[in-house]
Amino acid sequence: PPPPPPPPPPFCHPHAAIRDQPRSRGLGDVYKRQSYECVYKRIDTGKSKIDAWGIFVGKNNPTLLSIHGGPAAQYGFNYFDEFQTYAEAGFNVIACNPRGSSGRGHKFLRDVCGNKWGVNDTHDVVTAFKEMVKEMKISNKNYGIMGGSYGGFMTAWVISHYPKMFKSSVVERALLNWETMVGTSDIGITFPEMYLLEKFDKNINLYRKKSPITYANNIIAPTLIIHSENDYRCPIEQGEQLFSNLKRRGVESAMMRFPAESHELSRSGQPVHRKQRFEAIINWHKKHLT
């Protein structure tokens, strides 16, 4: 009988020419970095119980508060490259799921609608942040705040209502003016009424009352505005309004515009733009917090 066939090579590839080429190092070999562990706590804010997370780098390091979009979204027990990147840059990171977030039932999700918008969620975010700073025993009082979309709204809202609390802010792809969003956003017909519970032409004063741009004159924190030029969800005019206000009043500010990018820049934008975004955020916070 013929001899048995030789065993297959340890690394099989359908194309032998490719198989026999020297294998390049993987990204994991080139970019090995420390992974930072999260601490978790459910915080009683006095009005709700909020899930909060923190990445601790050091008690003498500055701290960033990151606010998710949505608001019907959530942070969870998963690896998030953004937080790891900021930790690697030397920042403690704190995040939470305030009322309005998903994952806690319909009542929790809708507990920011109408006149509750900017009230219940702000209470939860600010209270959770303060409690996590205590929990993590952070002594450095240099705090930065950031967020995108609804998180950008909340960032602008917090720095206009708590103007001395944060020394640095980054407002990304934000909802800043309900009044103009109605006529420019791809969800301008439905989203405002879904959350403000009033029609635009019936209660324009509510739309103005719940817009960060109304309170922009209170902002004193150095603010970086990041926006994509092809953002149809929160059109770039939203960011331009805030930038114009800050520049006009002499508040330290900058606006970074990304051409040919959408609302999804941070998640699916061109790699070069995503890298530039990370660098801009880190450099801005380092400039004002370290």
Predicted features and spans:
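Long, low-complexity Q/N-rich tracts
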Residues: P1-P10
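Short, small-residue-biased leader/transition segments that mark boundaries at the very start
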Residues: P14-Y31
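Acidic, amphipathic alpha-helical patches
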Residues: I18-D20, E82-F83, N203, P212
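A short, aliphatic-rich alpha-helical micro-motif
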Residues: S24, G58, A216-I219
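Short, conserved catalytic or adaptor-binding loops enriched in Gly and charged residues
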Residues: D29-R33, E198-K199
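Cap/lid segment of the alpha/beta-hydrolase catalytic domain
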Residues: R33-E135, K141
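Active-site-proximal cap/loop segments of hydrolase catalytic domains
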Residues: P98-T290
